[in-house]
Amino acid sequence: SFSSIRKRSTNSIIMHPEILSISLFWFVTAYTPGPNNVVASYSGFNFGIKRTIPHILGVTLGFTSLVIFLSIGLINFFKLFPVIQTIIKYLGTLFLIYLAYKIASSTISDETKKENPVKFIETFLFQYLNPKGVSVAIIVVSNYVELGDNYINYATQIVILAFLFSSTSITLWTFIGKFLRKFATNDKFIKYFNYAMSVLLLLSIITFYI
């Protein structure tokens, strides 16, 4: 009937009742230091904004796709097999240790002659191995996406927020790295900056086990 169609139409524009708390949670988790943000600053510092775009896209599209898959049912897989999260944590740790080594061992000639070691496909796939990102996505989808009349509506809003916060936060951290480049008056500064980024990356691993 016309009334039922009108009702469905009205429901289709209902905002999630906890949209503000979700947004605050996304904001805090997205903008605080983490593996993706540290690598973004490193890349922005050493390679500039343009050559960091693959990393920005990899994080944004990778994390958003993770939230989409969780929203359409992958979340149940994690609930049935919680050991999967433990495996992800260890695999993510190994990848970050490897990346920290690459950053710390990079030389000035590497940065000027070679392309950015942070590739799109590596960054995209890492979103599925990033313990912080996976945990955050699972928490949000588990608590805020429920089956029902507004399932598609709410899930869509969650995905949009994931895209917005991941893209803006990773871009901001890239610009922070680019800005700090202005203070790089000699090769020693660049070397120490890369060491600092490598250490921050290793420190971010500790948070996975707290």
Predicted feature residues:
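Juxtamembrane transmembrane-helix termini in multi-pass membrane transport proteins
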Residues: 16-79, 83, 139-158
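Alpha-helical transmembrane segments and their lipid-water interface positions
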Residues: 36, 58, 62-74, 96-99, ...
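Hydrophobic residues within alpha-helical transmembrane segments
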Residues: 24, 53, 57-61, 65, ...
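Hydrophobic alpha-helical transmembrane segments in multi-pass integral membrane proteins
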Residues: 69-71, 129-139, 200-210
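Selective transmembrane alpha-helices of multi-pass membrane proteins
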Residues: 79-108, 166-169, 173-176, 181-210
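Short, Lys/Arg-enriched N-terminal segments with co-localized hydrophobic residues
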Residues: 1-14
